[in-house]
């Protein structure tokens, strides 16, 4: 169940000493070929980390032989030296693997504004390269964790081919993408343009529909590598469906491990005039701190849902809005509906349905509650 499950993928992780916990903090995922096609999606934040800028350049060639990922330092807002360090990282991996640095993607996660400990990182690349294995995906997934409490992996099989993936992310989770690093692999034989469309389509309806705290990272990276080792050549829709399943699995694991969360909130907006309206309403509900506090207190406060909807530009009439919480329509036609005491909120997952009664479009956004643990964790996060 890891990123190295597809044929032609190897991986590994090691400890290089940038985490006070002493946990693994450097990961390597390698596409052994015969094909090395790749595509990716990056943060929409205008302040981009050095590894994002580097990897964007690498992907212009449509080929990636390996991805080096470090946790414990974002290498963001580090100026020319930060970019030089990323370049040196790619060069070291290229030398260890026998490839060109122009085919080595780099991803980083951790504290913004600090330089990476290159004296420890570069030897770590050599160590990770020496320990590469088709069974090394789990160790790679463990090595990219920051505030994550669990490592996150997923695999799905097609007809004679498969897709695997790993992800990290627990805080700064918001659309565009979400604060995350994701590496996806497949042994299907597909060209870069096909991979590019597939990964963008998958990200749009999975990672971009996760909104934990409304904060957008400088380092978000989703990479898709295709080895072609299975010889399988699926049609676009077949491949896209499997890829989407893997991304959805990983996205759900991200929200389930969000910092300090005690509730996972599934927000479904239905009967919207457009999909964009549905997404806007869902995101706005997801970011409403008063509602998130109410959910934490197991209070089915539908008024806060309507208040959030009212701040959007979506098409709707206030007197036609309906809201259900865990299946109980607590708001009907813009006013009180069924009794709030009918809503059972004891369980981890809370389902909110917002019916705009304005069209035929819908969208699902995943969020979580706001807790004292979240505040503590982020106030204690060292700067």
From Swiss-Prot:
<feature type="binding site">
    <location>
        <position position="383"/>
    </location>
    <ligand>
        <name>substrate</name>
    </ligand>
</feature>
<comment type="similarity">
    <text>Belongs to the ArgJ family.</text>
</comment>
<comment type="function">
    <text>Catalyzes two activities which are involved in the cyclic version of arginine biosynthesis: the synthesis of N-acetylglutamate from glutamate and acetyl-CoA as the acetyl donor, and of ornithine by transacetylation between N(2)-acetylornithine and glutamate.</text>
</comment>
<dbReference type="InterPro" id="IPR016117">
    <property type="entry name" value="ArgJ-like_dom_sf"/>
</dbReference>
<feature type="binding site">
    <location>
        <position position="259"/>
    </location>
    <ligand>
        <name>substrate</name>
    </ligand>
</feature>
<comment type="subunit">
    <text>Heterotetramer of two alpha and two beta chains.</text>
</comment>
<feature type="site" description="Cleavage; by autolysis">
    <location>
        <begin position="178"/>
        <end position="179"/>
    </location>
</feature>
<keyword id="KW-0055">Arginine biosynthesis</keyword>
<dbReference type="GO" id="GO:0005737">
    <property type="term" value="C:cytoplasm"/>
</dbReference>
<dbReference type="GO" id="GO:0006592">
    <property type="term" value="P:ornithine biosynthetic process"/>
</dbReference>
<comment type="pathway">
    <text>Amino-acid biosynthesis; L-arginine biosynthesis; N(2)-acetyl-L-ornithine from L-glutamate: step 1/4.</text>
</comment>
<dbReference type="GO" id="GO:0006526">
    <property type="term" value="P:L-arginine biosynthetic process"/>
</dbReference>
<feature type="binding site">
    <location>
        <position position="378"/>
    </location>
    <ligand>
        <name>substrate</name>
    </ligand>
</feature>
<dbReference type="InterPro" id="IPR042195">
    <property type="entry name" value="ArgJ_beta_C"/>
</dbReference>
<dbReference type="GO" id="GO:0004358">
    <property type="term" value="F:glutamate N-acetyltransferase activity"/>
</dbReference>
<feature type="binding site">
    <location>
        <position position="168"/>
    </location>
    <ligand>
        <name>substrate</name>
    </ligand>
</feature>
<keyword id="KW-0511">Multifunctional enzyme</keyword>
<keyword id="KW-0068">Autocatalytic cleavage</keyword>
<keyword id="KW-0028">Amino-acid biosynthesis</keyword>
<feature type="binding site">
    <location>
        <position position="146"/>
    </location>
    <ligand>
        <name>substrate</name>
    </ligand>
</feature>
<feature type="site" description="Involved in the stabilization of negative charge on the oxyanion by the formation of the oxyanion hole">
    <location>
        <position position="110"/>
    </location>
</feature>
<protein>
    <recommendedName>
        <fullName>Arginine biosynthesis bifunctional protein ArgJ 1</fullName>
        <ecNumber>2.3.1.35</ecNumber>
        <ecNumber>2.3.1.1</ecNumber>
    </recommendedName>
</protein>
<comment type="pathway">
    <text>Amino-acid biosynthesis; L-arginine biosynthesis; L-ornithine and N-acetyl-L-glutamate from L-glutamate and N(2)-acetyl-L-ornithine (cyclic): step 1/1.</text>
</comment>
<keyword id="KW-0963">Cytoplasm</keyword>
<feature type="binding site">
    <location>
        <position position="179"/>
    </location>
    <ligand>
        <name>substrate</name>
    </ligand>
</feature>
<feature type="site" description="Involved in the stabilization of negative charge on the oxyanion by the formation of the oxyanion hole">
    <location>
        <position position="109"/>
    </location>
</feature>
<feature type="region of interest" description="Disordered">
    <location>
        <begin position="1"/>
        <end position="25"/>
    </location>
</feature>
<keyword id="KW-0808">Transferase</keyword>
<keyword id="KW-0012">Acyltransferase</keyword>
<dbReference type="GO" id="GO:0004042">
    <property type="term" value="F:L-glutamate N-acetyltransferase activity"/>
</dbReference>
<feature type="active site" description="Nucleophile">
    <location>
        <position position="179"/>
    </location>
</feature>
<dbReference type="Pfam" id="PF01960">
    <property type="entry name" value="ArgJ"/>
</dbReference>
<dbReference type="InterPro" id="IPR002813">
    <property type="entry name" value="Arg_biosynth_ArgJ"/>
</dbReference>
